[in-house]
Amino acid sequence: MEGNFFIRSDAQRAHDNGFIAKQKPNLTTAPTAGQANESGCFDCNICLDTAHDPVVTLCGHLFCWPCIYKWLHVQLSSVSVDQHQNNCPVCKSNITITSLVPLYGRGMSSPSSTFGSKKQDALSTDIPRRPAPSALRNPITSASSLNPSLQHQTLSPSFHNHQYSPRGFTTTESTDLANAVMMSFLYPVIGMFGDLVYTRIFGTFTNTIAQPYQSQRMMQREKSLNRVSIFFLCCIILCLLLF
């Protein structure tokens, strides 16, 4: 009985070791299949390989920069330019080199042979660098669109220099301020004096036909206007004396 038990245990152990040995290659090959599926998301739609210097069109398709540059260059140099000018290879929508959006990442420390061949091909055909992002092309306009105060500063730097510099507030600016204050006081005073002169000389429709208590109200309004006009005149005289 004991001998049969040891024989069965040894056979079962050998069977288990063989099963584990058979299953080990499957465990090692599973991540490679996942990596292949992940790399498929970044394949160029022209060469069907992993995108080198990837760029994305506004219609949402991924390409290698050398591939899409050659595609656009061949279209522009072809005879039938009017029929196929700047069309996306996938959806045939209009695209331009300036509208391409580059993608950046960590990159690969040891590029593969396909990447090396693409680089050599790009150098041989004198393919330029892929276009920079729109934020780097026009930094002043993009920053001004995000910050309106920066746009105002670029449009009127002299105003900001006078505003923030300690010596910017000169006598000319003080006289301009005094003139502005005087005119702000003069305009309502002139208007009130004109109304008073017009009502006293020509009268109004309400004064001739209205009831006595309305005439009393008009007299009170005239008195208050006279007092306000005297106050404004005093303020104007003080401004002239001070400035």
From Swiss-Prot:
<keyword id="KW-1133">Transmembrane helix</keyword>
<dbReference type="GO" id="GO:0061630">
    <property type="term" value="F:ubiquitin protein ligase activity"/>
</dbReference>
<dbReference type="GO" id="GO:0005789">
    <property type="term" value="C:endoplasmic reticulum membrane"/>
</dbReference>
<comment type="pathway">
    <text>Protein modification; protein ubiquitination.</text>
</comment>
<protein>
    <recommendedName>
        <fullName>E3 ubiquitin-protein ligase RMA3</fullName>
        <ecNumber>2.3.2.27</ecNumber>
    </recommendedName>
</protein>
<dbReference type="InterPro" id="IPR045103">
    <property type="entry name" value="RNF5/RNF185-like"/>
</dbReference>
<keyword id="KW-0812">Transmembrane</keyword>
<keyword id="KW-0472">Membrane</keyword>
<dbReference type="GO" id="GO:0071456">
    <property type="term" value="P:cellular response to hypoxia"/>
</dbReference>
<dbReference type="InterPro" id="IPR017907">
    <property type="entry name" value="Znf_RING_CS"/>
</dbReference>
<dbReference type="GO" id="GO:0006511">
    <property type="term" value="P:ubiquitin-dependent protein catabolic process"/>
</dbReference>
<feature type="transmembrane region" description="Helical; Anchor for type IV membrane protein">
    <location>
        <begin position="223"/>
        <end position="243"/>
    </location>
</feature>
<dbReference type="GO" id="GO:0004842">
    <property type="term" value="F:ubiquitin-protein transferase activity"/>
</dbReference>
<keyword id="KW-0862">Zinc</keyword>
<dbReference type="InterPro" id="IPR018957">
    <property type="entry name" value="Znf_C3HC4_RING-type"/>
</dbReference>
<dbReference type="GO" id="GO:0016567">
    <property type="term" value="P:protein ubiquitination"/>
</dbReference>
<dbReference type="GO" id="GO:0008270">
    <property type="term" value="F:zinc ion binding"/>
</dbReference>
<feature type="zinc finger region" description="RING-type">
    <location>
        <begin position="44"/>
        <end position="92"/>
    </location>
</feature>
<feature type="region of interest" description="Disordered">
    <location>
        <begin position="110"/>
        <end position="135"/>
    </location>
</feature>
<comment type="function">
    <text>E3 ubiquitin-protein ligase.</text>
</comment>
<dbReference type="InterPro" id="IPR001841">
    <property type="entry name" value="Znf_RING"/>
</dbReference>
<keyword id="KW-0256">Endoplasmic reticulum</keyword>
<dbReference type="InterPro" id="IPR013083">
    <property type="entry name" value="Znf_RING/FYVE/PHD"/>
</dbReference>
<keyword id="KW-0808">Transferase</keyword>
<keyword id="KW-0479">Metal-binding</keyword>
<dbReference type="GO" id="GO:0005783">
    <property type="term" value="C:endoplasmic reticulum"/>
</dbReference>
<keyword id="KW-0863">Zinc-finger</keyword>
<keyword id="KW-0833">Ubl conjugation pathway</keyword>
<dbReference type="Pfam" id="PF00097">
    <property type="entry name" value="zf-C3HC4"/>
</dbReference>
